[in-house]
Amino acid sequence: MSDYQAILPLALIGLFILSQVLYLLASAVDFYLYSLPVNWVDMSEVGLLGPGDHPYIVLFYPVLNELEETMRTTLTSLGALDYPRDRYRVVAIPNAGDTDTVASLERLQREFPFLQLMPVPPTSDASWQVVWDAWNGNDKAYWWHRGRRANIRDLPPKKTRQLIYAFYTTVAEFAGREDFLIDYIDADSCPPSDHLLAAAVGIRHYDVLQTQNIAGNLNHTMAASWHAFDHMAWDGLKYPHLSANGRQPYWVLGKGTFFRASDLVTLGGFHPWLTIEDPEVGMRFWVNGRRLGIIENPLIEEVPSTLMKGITQRKRWVAGFFQSLNSPLREMGMSRWQRFKAWLIFLPCLSLSVNALGIPIGVWAMWTWLDDTSILPLWTVGLAAFNVATYAATLLVMYRSTWKRSALVLGSRRARLWYLLRVNPVFLSIWWLVWLVPLWIGYRMYVHDRGLVWERTEKINANEPLMQQLVR
């Protein structure tokens, strides 16, 4: 017998055991997250709001090279908001150099008189001084005071820069007046009519509010179905448990997020040097004692209709996750245990990489077991059986939640069944293998310090028919 023939069985057994242990650890993380309590915003309290109980809300709408039709669909939903008209404003914040989008928004202002426009100038403009002054006096803006990009004013041209300018400019306008809430959404985000009312209720109990999300075009293409399931499994099922009575670090989702303006000023605003701002700002709020509340009635958004566009979106998420979980955690003052708990948020996504090993070695193990030529110790088969049972139970929970939530955007049982068919366990296994691509690209973006330019997720106004039905 050659050395190769002697070593191969041991190597296969070792790889099988490794994959099963990793799956077991991933299941343990899931169990921990699902065991955490959820702090829901109680919408039954809306009726208790008096005339003075509606905080002023500024809703920022950052856009970049967007279709006018997509923005019209979003603005149609914003026009149906149920909130005192003198207690909120909607402010579109395109880059000043994005002349096509600015022109589209100016045309849309004729249809939607509530829409205000704040073009964001280059950082060389004198109006940015309000930002530099705020950061100079606030050590919580650690990126401005320490590190290789300290005091660099040439901020990367992406959504975060637009939010930074709009936020501090608005704070300066409100100086000496009442505190207010800020909310921001994406170009395609269509909030429900009670979106702002939920904020008025929730902010009485919590410091940060996060609205859940759901895809409206989930049956548009197979790729859209798979992309939408990410939101079903994360935004709609697992994410709410991060509220956890303040026990667990949390991220925010980057749309439908409410902060008190005074809190965001105190804690330094948004970090401009990360691919996405959502994870870092949420964890900075958590480590400074701000509690999270979850708004159940979701924003309706559009997911990419092709795999390549979905990979582009997800590689940016992954890069931002790695960036946010590195030096920022120490800069914001997290202990080692707190940093460990922060990493647990990313592990369910990162554990998808185990499939690169687990699926092929699992196929081999199953084949040899059925062929009665298995060389695996009996206890490893028991471990695998436990993992399979845990996986089946997890899928059952996901499908039950998906069936319930899909009713929000699909009008018939047939359409909902069709969606469940498109995300069956076999197809999900394929999709989770595809996830290896953005995981790898996103990791390389993190290692090489890329992702500072906004790679827009292209929207095609896929939700217009749905929103025409819902907004009447």
Briefly describe each language-model feature range.
Residues 175-190:
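Short beta-strand-to-loop acidic/aromatic patch adjacent to the donor-nucleotide binding site
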Residues 118-119, 126-176, 193-274, 311, ...:
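Long helical/loop segments within the catalytic core of UDP-sugar-dependent glycosyltransferases
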Residues 25-56, 330-342, 371-472:
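Juxtamembrane C-terminal module of membrane proteins
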Residues 75-87, 111:
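Short, acidic, metal-binding catalytic loop of nucleotide-sugar glycosyltransferases
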Residues 283-300:
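Catalytic donor-sugar/metal-binding loop of nucleotide-sugar-dependent glycosyltransferases
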Residues 1-76:
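N-proximal low-complexity "stem/linker" segments adjacent to membrane-targeting elements
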Residues 94-110, 121-129:
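A conserved acidic beta->alpha catalytic loop
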Residues 56-58, 89, 280:
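Cell-envelope/extracellular polymer assembly enzymes that use nucleotide-activated donors
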